[in-house]
Design a protein with these regions (language model features):
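Beta-rich carbohydrate-recognition modules and glycan-binding surfaces
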Residues: 1-225
Length: 225
C-alpha cells in the first residue's frame, strides 16, 4: 500500500482453498498491519466482495436468478427438508438446470438471496414479470397436491402465494414436459408484495403433500419480457 492512494487487491478463492480455507463457510474477512505493529494506522476499505468476475452481467433493472447457474448472492434452496438441491444437465435447450427433491419432511423450495440482499423490481411494475420454466420429473405421491408459486420480500415482511394455474399461461404441470410460467409484477404488487425488496422465489407442491416430488427449474428471471 502507498499512503494516500487507493489500491485494489484480489485473491483467488482457489488459492485460499489450496491454503486450507473452507470456502463453504466464510464468515470473517480482515485487513490489518502486522500484529503488535499497527499503532497509529488509519485506513479505509471499500468495494469488498466475494464474486465471480467472469459471470455474465445482468441487464440494469433486471435479475436473472437462474439460467445455467444461480445468480451471484443467491442460492438454490430447500427451506425445511434438509436436502441440498443440485444443478443437473437437461436437454439441449435448457442445459444446466436446478433440481429439487422432496421427501417425507414437509418443505418448500426455490431460490433464496443472501442475508441482507434483495432485488428492487419497482421499475418493472408496468410491464415486468417473474418468469420461469418448470419440468416435473416425478409427481408427488399425493394426487391432491397443487403446484404453487410463492414470492417474498426481505424479512418475510410481505409474501404472495399463487397456484401455477393463476399464471398467464394457466397450465397445470405435465410430468416430463417443460412449461413456462409467467406472473406480472403488477399482479404481485396488487396482491400485497413489497416489490422493492424481493429475496425469495419458491415453486413447490402443497405443504406436507410433496413427498416423492422431483422437479427441475430453469430460466428464472425478474425482467421486462
Amino acid at each position: 500500500p502507498v499512503t494516500g492512494e487507493w489500491q485494489t487487491y484480489t485473491f483467488k478463492l482457489s488459492d485460499l482453498a489450496g491454503a486450507g480455507l473452507d470456502v463453504s463457510a466464510i464468515d470473517v474477512l480482515m485487513i490489518f498491519p502486522a500484529w503488535g505493529a499497527g499503532e497509529g494506522a488509519v485506513y479505509r476499505v471499500d468495494n469488498v466482495k466475494i464474486y465471480n468476475p467472469n459471470a455474465a452481467p445482468v441487464a440494469s433493472g433486471e435479475l436473472n436468478v437462474f439460467t445455467d447457474t444461480v445468480a451471484d448472492q443467491w442460492s438454490i434452496w430447500d427451506c425445511c427438508g434438509g436436502s441440498t438441491p443440485t444443478t443437473e444437465t437437461d436437454d439441449d435447450q435448457h442445459g444446466a438446470v436446478a433440481q429439487f427433491s422432496i421427501g417425507a419432511t414437509p418443505t418448500v423450495m426455490g431460490f433464496l438471496a443472501d442475508e441482507g440482499v434483495s432485488f428492487d423490481a419497482s421499475a418493472l411494475i408496468e410491464n415486468g414479470v417473474v418468469q420461469f420454466d418448470l419440468k416435473v420429473i416425478t409427481a408427488p405421491s399425493n394426487v391432491d397436491a397443487q403446484w404453487l408459486f410463492k414470492i417474498e420480500s426481505i424479512g418475510a415482511s410481505s409474501a404472495v402465494e399463487l397456484a401455477l394455474t393463476q399464471s398467464n399461461e394457466g397450465q397445470t404441470p405435465v410430468t416430463g414436459e417443460w412449461q413456462t410460467y409467467t406472473f406480472p409484477i403488477g399482479q404481485l404488487f396488487d396482491a400485497g408484495l413489497d416489490i422493492s425488496a424481493i429475496n425469495v422465489l419458491m415453486v413447490f407442491p402443497t405443504w406436507d403433500m410433496g413427498n416423492g416430488a422431483l422437479y427441475r427449474i430453469d430460466n428464472v428471471i425478474i425482467a421486462n419480457p
